[in-house]
């Protein structure tokens, strides 16, 4: 009996030792795996179509979104950032440069940049993530069901047109005609104009438009448009928004209010906007990019995403300059009220 007990004890000791060694080996393996993962480094190329607040916020939010997923500039992320200064030729040069550099991921901020990057990335086999693309279908970056047309996906900043029209009607009960300036080569802008024209009648508005090709066209187009309208509303049109101070100066001289499409435009002096938070949009995009970089998903497996909820922003300083009284209920329910105009 004594011999059996000893043998059992030895067996127990052997099993215990094996468990300890196994646990140690597993710990070492996990640690080694974690070290390898931590040492994974990425290089991305970010192309931003133009320099203005909403697109800057997208870029800021994008990097924050990556950081929240463990991918941080200066640690395991190298960023090549280029601004196209609203020039399509420059877009192509930047895109080709990223392809030649064989970056791990291309990021397009605004529609022209997204389209340009995708054209360069198709042959290079590099995935593309975009943000601030109002209509991915019109831009031919997604199919009719919202699925990617290739290794490209991202987030849309589709305008809340109904909410904007409701807000304008509430703020300007006597207004009849809304003016919209847009870039004729931007598919997103054309789609947004069409939606405004389709919905305007529901709120007893008419839409008057002015198409432009470059920023050089804006002063003359604005002058003509301001003669025909009671107010203007902006799209997320990059060429127009980059010249917003010029438009506001001309409109203010005629006491014609200009409504924005997001928070940064309201800060600059637009009367109000039903708009998106572009930092949050950027964060959402960064999290999508992290999935692609880590190999968890292919870009082609991720349908584009949107932020559904719009927020009201108003500028009381702009209202005072225009001699317009903003309804109290609007200032009370606004996500943010600005009491001064920020210099561009």
What are these regions (language model features)?
Residues 15-37:
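Sec-dependent N-terminal signal peptides of Gram-positive bacterial secreted proteins and lipoproteins
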């Amino acid at each position: 009996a004594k011999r059996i007990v000893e043998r059992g004890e030895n067996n127990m000791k052997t099993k215990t030792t094996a468990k300890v060694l196994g646990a140690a080996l597993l710990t070492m393996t996990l640690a080694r795996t974690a070290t390898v993962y931590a040492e994974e480094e990425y290089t991305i190329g970010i192309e931003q179509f133009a320099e203005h607040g909403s697109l800057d916020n997208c870029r800021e939010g994008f990097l924050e979104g990556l950081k929240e997923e463990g991918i941080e500039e200066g640690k395991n992320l190298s960023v090549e950032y280029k601004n196209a200064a609203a020039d399509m030729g420059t877009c192509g040069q930047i895109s080709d440069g990223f392809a030649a550099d064989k970056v791990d991921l291309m990021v397009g901020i605004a529609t022209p940049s997204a389209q340009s990057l995708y054209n360069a990335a198709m042959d290079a086999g590099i995935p593309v993530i975009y943000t601030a693309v109002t209509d991915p279908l019109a831009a031919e970056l997604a199919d009719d069901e919202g699925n990617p047309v290739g290794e490209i996906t991202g987030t849309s900043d589709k305008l809340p047109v109904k909410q904007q029209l409701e807000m304008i009607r509430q703020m300007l009960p006597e207004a009849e005609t809304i003016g919209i300036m847009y870039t004729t080569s931007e598919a997103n802008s054309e789609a947004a104009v069409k939606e405004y024209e389709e919905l305007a009648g529901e709120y007893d508005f008419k839409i008057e438009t002015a198409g432009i090709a470059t920023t050089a066209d804006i002063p003359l187009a604005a002058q003509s448009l301001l003669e025909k309208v009671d107010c203007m509303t902006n799209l997320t049109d990059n060429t127009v928004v980059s010249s917003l101070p010029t438009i506001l100066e001309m409109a203010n001289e005629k006491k014609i209010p200009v409504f924005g499409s997001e928070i940064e435009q309201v800060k600059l002096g637009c009367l109000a906007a039903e708009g998106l938070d572009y930092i949050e949009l950027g964060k959402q995009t960064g999290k999508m990019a992290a999935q692609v970089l880590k190999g968890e998903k292919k870009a082609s497996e991720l349908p584009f995403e949107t932020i559904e909820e719009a927020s009201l922003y108003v500028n009381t300083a702009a209202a005072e300059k225009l001699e317009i009284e903003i309804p109290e209920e609007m200032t009370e329910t606004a996500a943010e009220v600005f009491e001064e105009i920020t210099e561009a």
